[in-house]
Amino acid sequence: MNEMTVKTRFAPSPTGALHLGNLRTALFNALLAYGHGGRFVLRIEDTDRERYSPEATRSLMGDLRWLGLDWQEGPEVGGPAPPYHQFERGFLYDAYYRQLEAEGWAYPCFCSERELEMARRAQRSAGQPPRYPGTCARLTAEEVARKRAEGMQPALRFRVPSGDEVRFEDRIHGEQRFRTDDIGDFIIRRADGTAAYLFTNAVDDALMGITDVLRGDDHLTNTPRQLLILQALGLAAPRYGHMGLITGNDGAPLSKRNGSRSVGELARDGYLPEAMLNYLARVGHTCESEALLDLAGLAEGFDPARISTAPSRFDPDHLRHWQEEAVHGSSVRRLRPWMGIDALVPPGYAEDLVNAVRGNVRFPAEARDWAKRVFAGPPELDADAEAAIVSAGAEFFEAAAGAAEEGYTRFKGLTEAVKERTGVKGKQLFMPLRAALTGRCSGPELQPVVDLMGGERVVERLRRAATLAAEQGAQGE
């Protein structure tokens, strides 16, 4: 790895939002490059113009930058092998197509989809793997010219040598062997003139000097075809590693139907970039550290040898765990705008509220809920809070409200006064007070929350609890 500059790439086809499966691919390739002082390349594979979306491309690049996955070569930053949009690289592909045809490695194919489907059916019926039967492989120059004169537009097929074997060392799966007789001649340019993925992807990796490619194992069977193309062209091939896919709870590849969400959706919910990165760095990859790490730390601990060949199930609870770690590790300066609480908090109190609730929130919506519970009118009581108030009884809250009305509205003074007047202590003291003052039986440490409320709110909420306890007690008699 130290003999040459490691260069990896992320080569998406942006037709929609960036989702977690593709993000993990980008992350693993970036970490491999960053960890070896190499270069991370972004290449946009946009040859399918019907599905290509400029908006999706801009969104994807914005997501990568927001996550801190900066590319050293690619769109908007340039590099030694431009352009970095495949649609603009057609002139490069044309030269290699001509080379393959001239050297006998490629030939025009005039077969219709109907003819190809009939051949596949016959092969399946005979218990053979479906592959191109070679119908056009032996056409003479005269036959090709006649078909063209008739207006037939051919695809271009790569001529796979028979009786051979393609071997390569996969960085994750180990040694791989594929019989060329099982591959069959494959299309490298469609009849409409557009370049095929297998061809452009392989050629661009070589021309851009990509040394290592980490991708999903759904691409494993593409690799022998791409190695054959590069060998025929005399171009260097990268080292490939194919990792198990991320699946949903149903075991199917992760998608919207089984729990996948886009990076943008998660960001709008308040997920922090380091939460996503720390989670994904551990999906199908063993990370020795259990601590929240920055990109440099993740890169230092990344090793393709520790990537699993088995599928990895998406675990939203694990993602939320890393979100909690990320929030707890963030500064007040960062959390304040992230929480979006300023409009809900009196001037001068925002940072105090951040400090009060930061240990118990994972998302901005939770922080805003606590801002309302502290500074707005009496909060709505959940069922557990109401039960705790009724259980403590009217006498307890009359004593608490009386103490507050006498000026004991800060937490320490209030609890000492209530304890002295009622003889109640411990959980039986704190739980009813929490329920009455916040509307919930769990949450942040009570002292800073109560001290932020102010005397009027404390009195109002304790009086409400006393009334509720009295009414419920009377009904139970």
Swiss-Prot record:
One of its GO terms (molecular function) is tRNA binding. A motif ('HIGH' region) lies at residues 12-22. Its main location: cytoplasm. PROSITE patterns: AA_TRNA_LIGASE_I. Monomer. Catalyzes the attachment of glutamate to tRNA(Glu) in a two-step reaction: glutamate is first activated by ATP to form Glu-AMP and then transferred to the acceptor end of tRNA(Glu). Belongs to the class-I aminoacyl-tRNA synthetase family. Glutamate--tRNA ligase type 1 subfamily. This is Glutamate--tRNA ligase 1.
